[in-house]
């Protein structure tokens, strides 16, 4: 396995699960959004405000291309990374892809107090999350080697299921 890549919506647990997986596998953990923030010296909401979503997505595409060239990392992506064909191709080629699926209710609960989510600056975040998932779910599934449900499950149990499911896959 070159890399282990986590995709899924906001609030699915990609960063939390990714850190635990990296520790378990003794691999470095990278979060594409955090890497963008480190490189630019600006947080994601500021980038959205100054460059708009298209500007952020350009930065994200470059970061994903770079991170997928690595060897032996656990990578958590932003929820919208799958929207670009180039990202989906890079993620698929970059390693094993795990789709962490979470219900809208779980996503709302996990993101409610997070001010770093520009797309959720709205009166009705559940509606926005529902609309985003309707568009993105087929794209997550398109590139996923494994789909894992995260609702009402402790992160450690999710990690154990991911490792077990990946062990069952034939080499590629």
From Swiss-Prot:
Which residues does the annotation say bind substrate?
33, 57, 79, 136
Q: Does the keyword Hydrolase apply?
A: no
Q: In which pathway does it act?
A: Metabolic intermediate biosynthesis; chorismate biosynthesis; chorismate from D-erythrose 4-phosphate and phosphoenolpyruvate: step 5/7
Keyword flag ATP-binding:
yes
Cofactor, free-text remark: Binds 1 Mg(2+) ion per subunit.
List keywords of the entry alphabetically.
Amino-acid biosynthesis, Aromatic amino acid biosynthesis, ATP-binding, Cytoplasm, Kinase, Magnesium, Metal-binding, Nucleotide-binding, Transferase
Task: Please classify the protein's predominant subcellular localization into one broad category.
Answer: cytoplasm
The record describes its quaternary structure and partners as: Monomer.
PANTHER family assigned? SHIKIMATE KINASE (PTHR21087), SHIKIMATE KINASE 1, CHLOROPLASTIC (PTHR21087:SF16)
What protein name applies here? Shikimate kinase
Source species = Pseudomonas syringae pv. tomato (strain ATCC BAA-871 / DC3000)
């Amino acid at each position: 396995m070159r890399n282990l890549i986590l995709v899924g919506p906001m609030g699915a647990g990609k960063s939390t699960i990714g850190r635990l997986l990296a520790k378990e596998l003794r691999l470095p953990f990278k979060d594409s959004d955090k890497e963008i923030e480190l490189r630019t010296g600006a947080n994601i909401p500021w980038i959205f405000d100054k460059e708009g979503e298209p500007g952020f997505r350009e930065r994200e595409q470059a970061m994903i291309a770079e991170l997928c060239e690595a060897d032996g990392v656990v990578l958590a992506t932003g929820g919208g990374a799958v929207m670009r064909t180039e990202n989906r191709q890079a993620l698929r080629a970059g390693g094993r892809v795990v789709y962490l699926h979470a219900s809208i209710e779980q996503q709302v609960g996990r993101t409610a107090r997070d001010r770093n989510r520009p797309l959720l600056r709205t009166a009705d975040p559940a509606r926005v999350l529902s609309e985003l998932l309707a568009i993105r779910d087929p794209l997550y599934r398109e590139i996923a080697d494994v789909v894992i449900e995260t609702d009402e499950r402790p992160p450690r149990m999710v990690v154990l299921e991911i490792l077990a499911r990946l062990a069952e896959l034939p080499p590629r």
